[in-house]
Amino acid sequence: MQCVRVPGSRRHRARLAVLVLVSLVGSVQLPHAAMADKVKVKTEISAAADLNPDRNGRASPVVLLMFQLSSVDAFQNADFFSLFDPAAAIIAADMLERTEMTLQPGEIRPLEAEFDEEARYIGLVAAFRDVEKAQWRGIVELPDKGFLKKVFSRDKLLIQLQALAVTASIE
C-alpha cells in the first residue's frame, strides 16, 4: 500500500492549529485585578511652603506614597518602615495599587488619578525627615457609589502636606 500525499494538507493542518490556538487564547480570562474597572478622580495635592523642615527650619521635598486599599486595618497598624518598603508585604492582601511621587515645598499638583473600583480607602504615607514627630500617615475612606454616580461624579480628592503632617479629604 502506498501513501498518497494530498497537496496542501500540511498547510491545512497549520491553519487549523493556528485557528485552535487563537480560539483557546481568546477564551482565557484575565485575573480579576487586571480586568477591574478604573474610576477617574480629580485629585489635588498641595504642599506647604514650610514642608518637611530640616534642623535649620529650611523646607525640603517629601516623598508621598499613595495606596489604594480594599481594607484599612493592616495599614493602620503598620509602622512607617513596613509601609515605605516597596514590597509592603504587611499590607499586600489589602493593597490594590501603590503610587510614589516627590513633592516640592509650595507645590500644587493637580492630577486625574485612576482608582481601582474595588478600592475603599486611600492610604497616604509621607516620608518626613522627622518621622517621630510627624503625622506621616493619612487615610481617607472613598464613597461607595454605584455605576452612574461614578460616571457623573464631581468628587475631588484633596491631599494636603503641611510642615509635618499629611491629611486628605473628599469634597
Predicted regions and their residues:
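Short amphipathic, basic-aromatic surface patches that mediate peripheral association
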Residues: 44-55
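Bacterial N-terminal signal peptides that target proteins for export
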Residues: 3-18
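Bacterial N-terminal signal peptides
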Residues: 17-27
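Glycine-rich, aromatic-bearing surface loops/beta-hairpins
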Residues: 137-171
